[in-house]
Design a protein with these regions (language model features):
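Mobile beta-alpha loop/short-helix "lid" or hinge segments that flank ligand
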Residues: 57-63, 155, 170-173
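Generic structural signal for secondary-structure transition and capping sites
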Residues: 27, 92, 161, 165, ...
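Residue-level recognition of short, well-ordered coil/turn positions
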Residues: 26, 61, 125, 190-191
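C-terminal regulatory/effector modules of DNA-binding transcriptional regulators
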Residues: 41, 169-238
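Hydrophobic residues in alpha-helical segments
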Residues: 22, 98, 121, 186-187
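Short linear motifs at protein or domain termini
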Residues: 1-100, 105, 210-238
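Conserved amphipathic alpha-helical segments that form helical-bundle/coiled-coil interaction surfaces
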Residues: 79, 83, 102-166, 176-185, ...
Length: 238
């Protein structure tokens, strides 16, 4: 895996701005991303914008073609399934270590955070939801006390968050308390119970993501033959 480049202050500003637009659905899958337009909107030169887009491309959120430009990347079914295989391997290990190593204070913290995530999931504030959702999974990994594992898990969440937001705008979760149930399993202090709780959670997320992305899979295949032009996004079939 390539390491994302270090960003300057302006590059970081551009990175956060474009990433936020993707997560909020302002830049949907397949949408063209114009360096010129972003630079003008943010009042900066092309260089920091190009650095930001390069990092987003390395993270898998964007893709570029020579003489065609840059767009929000449309994943294939294999992309999504492969991503979740990796995520399951990483996060089940984090869950197992959490069950062994987390302190009582950390367990209480995670239970409260999970309740907040599930409460936000029943609202339409998806950006705030995603921030808390990423924080929850990051804290689980941090409590596993393995920095390399924590870093790897954090890298997987940008893509998952983007896919979760597809055709969002309503409630994000259909289950009553998915994250509270997850954390309760992790706090059982049994590594096997924690592992299965996380495995079930990730597999449920995969199923939900595949359903949300299904209309895009064929579009991603057909649009490969004609890369989307500037200012025009992908239109879903009715």
């Amino acid at each position: 895996m390539k390491t994302p480049p270090e960003l300057t202050t302006l590059s970081s500003e551009a990175y956060e701005s474009v990433r936020r637009r993707i997560l909020q659905g302002e830049l949907p899958l397949g949408e063209a991303v114009s360096r010129r337009r972003i630079a003008a909107e943010l009042g900066m030169s092309f260089l920091p914008v190009s650095e930001a887009l390069m990092r987003l491309e390395l993270e898998g959120l964007l893709e570029s073609r020579p003489r065609a430009g840059t767009r929000v990347r449309i994943p294939s079914r294999d992309d999504v399934q492969g991503h979740y295989i990796v995520r399951e391997a990483l996060e089940t290990q984090a869950a197992r270590l959490f069950a062994k190593l987390a302190t009582p204070r950390e367990r209480t913290e995670l239970k409260k955070l999970a309740a907040r995530v599930d409460a936000l999931a029943r609202k339409a504030d998806r950006l705030h939801y995603l921030q808390l959702h990423e924080r929850l999974h990051r804290r689980i990994a941090e409590c596993a006390r393995c920095p390399a594992l924590s870093h790897a898990i954090e890298q997987t969440h940008s893509l998952a968050s983007t896919w979760l937001c597809v055709q969002g705008g309503g409630k994000l979760e259909k289950l009553d308390h998915p994250h509270e149930d997850l954390v309760n399993g992790l706090c059982d202090r049994d590594p096997d119970v924690a592992t299965e709780a996380m495995r079930s959670h990730v597999q449920t997320s995969l199923q939900r993501t595949m359903i949300r992305l299904d209309p895009y899979f064929q579009l991603g295949h057909t649009s490969d033959r004609k890369f989307i032009r500037k200012g025009r996004g992908t239109t879903l079939p009715s």
